[in-house]
Amino acid sequence: MMSGVPPLKPSRSFLPQDSGPMLHRSPSGAKRKIRQKREEASRPSPFLSPSSSSSQTSISPTPTETSSNYRSLVDSGDYQSILPDFDPSFVPVPTPRLSVPFSASMSTLELSSSTLSSPVTAPAPPPPPTSKPTVEVHPMPTDERSPSMASSLNGSIDIDIYKPKPPVPIKPKGLRIDHLNR
């Protein structure tokens, strides 16, 4: 056949970008953001101490290597957290607050009620941290609302109910409607 021409290989796809030289495009917005995040992660943070920032500079930009470097830091004991030590047994309990300011009349009420009844016991301890919170379910109120309350809830609907409808105009005597030619 032809001796000077090499045999042609069939290409897998006939897309126009495969035919010519590769054009270098600017990265899309998502790729640009990913690149910026990688660059920011490789730069030391000004908020970290010098000892921890020196360990941060060795992070490589690929995600799999980043997670393996983190794991190796934790395993070797060189990882230093910037967060304070957390005691898992400590659970903050909010102190109860009075919604009404304390007055002398309330103190006499407390004294008189405590002398008549048994001694006041301490409030129930808070539930353990692993249990789910208690939810109180109340039935829906019946329709025994006052008209002012109802009108404030359903303003435009109630106004339409109380507004008198306009009278229907009287049909003119000479009006003829042909129902077949509509």
From Swiss-Prot:
This is Uncharacterized protein B0353.1. Residues 1-73, 105-182 are annotated as: Disordered. Residues 122-131 have a biased composition (Pro residues). It comes from the Eukaryota. Residues 43-68, 105-121 have a biased composition (Low complexity). It comes from Caenorhabditis elegans.
